[in-house]
UniProtKB/Swiss-Prot annotation:
Gene3D superfamilies: 6.10.140.1460, q2cbj1_9rhob like domain, Tetratricopeptide repeat domain. SMART domains: P4Hc (SM00702). Binds 1 Fe(2+) ion per subunit. Pfam families: 2OG-FeII_Oxy_3, P4Ha_N, TPR_P4H. The gene is phy-2. Its main location: endoplasmic reticulum. This is Prolyl 4-hydroxylase subunit alpha-2. It catalyses: L-prolyl-[collagen] + 2-oxoglutarate + O2 = trans-4-hydroxy-L-prolyl-[collagen] + succinate + CO2. GO terms for molecular function: iron ion binding; L-ascorbic acid binding; peptidyl-proline 4-dioxygenase activity; procollagen-proline 4-dioxygenase activity. Its cofactor is Fe(2+); L-ascorbate. Glycans are attached at residue 110. Heterotetramer of two alpha chains and two beta chains. Exist either as a phy-2(2)/pdi-2(2) tetramer or as a phy-1/phy-2/pdi-2(2) tetramer. InterPro entries: Oxoglu/Fe-dep_dioxygenase_dom, P4HA-like, Pro_4_hyd_alph, Pro_4_hyd_alph_FE2OG_OXY, Pro_4_hyd_alph_N, TPR-like_helical_dom_sf. It comes from Caenorhabditis elegans.
Length: 539
C-alpha cells in the first residue's frame, strides 16, 4: 500500500538531476511552499490533525519563510540546498506516512494531479544522494572540517543553518551506500556528537553505531569496531545482527593483543576516480598556487588589443596569465544585458551535461561532471550572433567552424574533473561528423562570479583562474603543428558558495590555416593574441 501511495504521490513529480544545476534548485524553492499549503489544506479537509503533522507544517512554514527572505541565493549555499532536498524527500515521506494512517490517499491524489498540471518539480532519491555526495566533494576539495561543515561553518564563517544528528547521519549513510567508508566514518562520528546535545535525539544511537562500526572495520580499525558493536548489542539487545557481528570481530582478532587502550583511529582516504593529480587539483582549487617562474614573472602583463580596424576605436583589454602554453583573460567582453539574454535563452534547454566515452564514442552522464548545459545557435538571437562575431575579433580565429555556444549552469558542488578539450588520437570518432578537425582553442565566458570556489585550474601548469564576471578566458588546445597540447588538461573546481554560469566556444582547426599557421620550429609558440605585437603601440 505504501508503495502504491508513493507512486500516486510522486508520479510525474520526482525529477532526478535537480542537484546538477543551481537554476533548478532555485525553481524548486516554490515546491517547499507548496508542501506547506498541502498540509494546511489536509488539516482543514479532515478537521483533525496529529501533533506530529502540525509540527511538520510549522517547520515547513518557518523554513520556507526563511528561504524566501533570502531569495534565490538561498540554494547557492550547499548546506541549505542539501536540507531543502532532504526535507522534500526523507521528511516528506514521514508526512506521507502520517497522512496514510488517516486514509488520505484520495486527498493526496488530488494534490498530485494539481502538481502535475502546474509542472512543479520535486526532487527524487538521486537528488538527495547527489546533494550528499556534493557535500563530501566540497569537504575534500576545500579541506573542510566535518563538524564545522555540519554546523554551517565554512572558512570560519557561519554561512547557513546547522545539520541535525539525523541530517548528518543521512550524509554518512549516503557515503556508506557508495562504499565510501572514509566519509561514512567521519560523518557518523559527528552524528554521535550531535545527538548528545539533542533532546529528544533526531535519530537513535544504535542506528548510528551499526554504520560507524562497520566503517571502522573497513578502514582497518577492528578493535574499535568490536568495541562499538558490543555497545550496540547492549543498548539494542534485539538487534538482528549485533551479536553475530560481535562474534565475527572476535574471531577476526583471535590471538591478537586485546589488552590496553584502543589504538588511534586509522581513516585513510581512498581514491576511486583514478585521477592521479587529485592532490594538485584540489590544492589549486583552494588557491594554493605555486609562484610564477622567475623567467616569466616580469613578462606577464596587460595590454590593449587593437590589431583590427574596429578595435582601434574600441580596443579590448587583455591580461596575459601564462606563457607556454599561452593563456589570456579578455576583460569585459560580454555585457550584463547579453548575459541575461543568454541565460534566458538557455534555461528552458538545460539538460544534464554529458561526456564522450573514449572507447565507444557515445555521450553519457558522468559523476565527474556535474552541471547542466544547453547549446545556442548563432541565428537564435541577435545577441548570440553578436557575441560570436566579438569572439572572432578578440581571438582572430575564424568562427565558421566553431561549435555552437554552450551555456552551463553548475549545480550543488558543481564541477568537471580534469579533462582535455581536444580529442586524443585514441578517441573513437571524435568530431568526425563535424568534419572540421580538432578543437584548436577554447573561449570560456564567466557569466557570474561565485562567492567561493568554481575556479578553472590547469593541473600540470599550476595555474588557477577564478571566475570574474564579464571576462573570457582563452587558451589554445593544440600546438601550432596540430598536435594536442597535453599541458592544457584542466578542470572546473566545485562551486563552494554561490552560482556559476559560464558559456564557452570551442573553435576548430579548419579555416585557421592562415590565421595560425604551423611555425618553422616546433617549440616556437605564441606570446600574445593577434597578428601583430601589441606592445609597440601601447601607450
Amino acid at each position: 500500500m505504501r508503495a502504491v501511495l508513493l507512486v500516486c504521490l510522486l508520479a510525474g513529480l520526482a525529477h532526478a538531476d535537480l542537484f546538477t544545476a543551481i537554476a533548478d534548485l532555485q525553481h524548486m524553492l516554490g515546491a517547499e511552499k507548496d508542501v506547506t499549503t498541502i498540509i494546511d489544506q489536509y488539516i482543514e479537509a479532515e478537521r483533525a490533525r496529529l501533533d506530529d503533522l502540525r509540527r511538520y507544517a510549522h517547520e515547513y512554514v518557518h523554513r520556507n519563510a526563511h528561504a524566501e527572505s533570502v531569495g534565490p541565493e538561498f540554494v547557492t549555499n550547499p548546506i541549505n540546498a542539501y536540507l531543502l532536498i532532504k526535507r522534500l524527500t526523507t521528511e516528506w515521506k514521514k508526512v506521507e506516512n502520517i497522512m496514510l494512517n488517516n486514509k488520505a490517499s484520495t486527498f493526496l491524489k488530488n494534490i498530485t494531479d494539481n502538481r502535475v498540471r502546474s509542472e512543479v518539480k520535486f526532487p527524487g532519491e538521486e537528488d538527495l544522494s547527489g546533494a550528499a555526495t556534493a557535500l563530501l566533494r566540497l569537504q575534500d576539495t576545500y579541506s573542510l572540517d566535518t563538524l564545522d561543515l555540519s554546523n554551517g561553518i565554512i572558512g570560519g564563517e557561519k554561512v547557513s543553518n546547522k545539520l541535525s544528528g539525523h541530517d548528518t547521519f543521512e550524509v554518512g549513510r549516503s557515503a556508506y551506500n557508495q562504499k565510501d567508508y572514509y566519509h561514512c566514518l567521519m560523518w557518523m562520528q559527528v552524528a554521535l556528537v550531535k545527538i548528545e546535545n539533542e533532546n529528544p535525539p533526531t535519530i537513535e544511537e544504535w542506528e548510528i553505531l551499526e554504520y560507524l562500526a562497520y566503517s571502522l572495520y573497513q578502514q582497518g580499525n577492528v578493535r574499535r569496531a568490536l568495541s562499538l558493536t558490543k555497545r550496540l548489542a547492549k543498548i539494542a539487545p534485539n538487534h538482528p545482527r549485533a551479536k553475530g557481528n560481535v562474534k565475527w570481530y572476535e574471531d577476526m582478532l583471535q590471538g591478537k593483543d586485546m589488552v590496553g587502550d584502543l589504538p588511534p583511529i586509522v581513516n585513510k582516504r581512498v581514491e576511486y576516480d583514478g585521477i592521479v593529480e587529485r592532490d594538485a587539483y584540489e590544492a589549486l582549487c583552494r588557491g594554493e598556487i605555486p609562484p610564477v617562474e622567475p623567467k616569466w614573472k616580469n613578462k606577464l602583463r596587460c595590454y590593449l588589443k587593437r590589431d583590427k580596424p574596429f578595435l582601434k576605436l574600441a580596443p579590448i583589454k587583455v591580461e596575459i596569465l601564462r606563457f607556454d602554453p599561452l593563456a589570456v583573460l579578455f576583460k569585459n567582453v560580454i555585457h550584463d544585458s547579453e548575459i541575461e539574454v543568454i541565460k534566458e535563452l538557455a534555461s528552458p534547454k538545460l539538460k544534464r551535461a554529458t561526456v564522450q566515452n573514449s572507447k565507444t564514442g557515445e555521450l553519457e552522464h558522468a559523476t565527474y561532471r556535474i552541471s547542466k548545459s544547453a547549446w545556442l545557435k548563432g541565428d537564435l538571437d541577435p545577441v548570440i550572433d553578436r557575441v560570436n562575431r566579438r569572439i572572432e575579433d578578440f581571438t582572430n580565429l575564424n568562427q565558421a567552424t566553431s561549435e555552437e555556444l554552450q551555456v552551463a549552469n553548475y549545480g550543488l558542488g558543481g564541477h568537471y574533473d580534469p579533462h582535455f578539450d581536444f580529442a586524443r588520437k585514441e578517441e573513437k570518432n571524435a568530431f568526425k561528423t563535424l568534419n572540421t578537425g580538432n578543437r584548436i582553442a577554447t573561449v570560456l565566458f564567466y557569466m557570474s562570479q561565485p562567492e567561493r570556489g568554481g575556479a578553472t585550474v590547469f593541473n600540470h601548469l599550476g595555474t588557477a583562474v577564478f571566475p570574474s564576471k564579464n571576462d573570457a578566458l582563452f587558451w589554445y588546445n593544440l600546438r601550432r603543428d596540430g598536435e594536442g597540447d597535453l599541458r592544457t588538461r584542466h578542470a572546473a573546481c566545485p562551486v563552494l558558495l554561490g552560482v556559476k554560469w559560464v558559456s564557452n566556444k570551442w573553435i576548430h582547426e579548419k579555416g585557421q590555416e592562415f590565421t595560425r599557421p604551423c611555425g618553422l620550429e616546433e617549440e616556437v609558440q605564441e606570446n600574445f593574441i593577434g597578428d601583430l605585437s601589441p606592445y609597440a603601440n601601447d601607450p
